[in-house]
A protein has these predicted regions:
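Conserved active-site-adjacent core of cysteine acyl-enzyme catalytic domains
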Residues: 28, 39-160
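Active-site nucleophile-adjacent alpha helix/oxyanion-hole segment immediately C-terminal to the catalytic cysteine
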Residues: 2-49
């Protein structure tokens, strides 16, 4: 298959720092589990708080949202691995790191939902306000890419 898309219902993040909870919610919904962002945050953080998440907390969020063991890879996936995962019908979380003057300056979570091997692109669902689903060049995603919600690169992957 040269292209594949997994239907991922887009949930907008309900708080300014809940991109990770919204992304976990999208993955859970796609895999058949309905859970709220508040439930995810409370499960992971121990309270309902508008706070970002570290990599382990994002992994725990995906595990809770899907009721399946999730795996954290502290880097981008090779394109072939990303397409293999999506071809099984399973979206995955991408951690984007924003940079300013060459230094990390924040991060954001989005969900990969499709690919096209002919064009070398991945489709990404962004939970940030006013964003949606858009296709990006894989090579730019792992180096320096202008995403809908900021400019940075793919630095971690969480999948089930």
């Amino acid at each position: 298959t040269f292209a594949n898309a997994v239907y991922v219902y887009r949930y907008q993040q309900e708080q300014t720092h809940w991109c990770w909870a919204a992304s976990a919610q999208m993955i859970g919904h796609t895999l058949g589990r309905q859970v709220t962002q508040t439930d995810i945050v409370t499960q992971v953080k121990g309270m309902d708080i508008n706070d970002g998440a570290n990599d382990t907390e994002m992994k725990n969020a995906v595990t809770y949202a899907t009721l399946r063991n999730s795996v954290l890879r502290s880097s981008a996936w090779p394109f072939a691995s990303a397409t293999n995962e999506l071809s099984t019908g399973e979206p995955f979380l991408i951690k984007l790191t924003w940079y300013k003057n060459g230094e990390p300056n924040g991060a954001h979570a989005v969900v990969a939902s499709g690919y096209n091997t002919a064009s070398g692109t991945l489709t990404v669902v962004d939970p940030w306000y006013g964003c949606g689903t858009k296709t990006f060049d894989y090579k730019s995603m792992i180096t320096n890419c202008k995403f809908q919600s900021g400019t940075g690169k793919w630095t971690a992957t969480i999948y089930v």
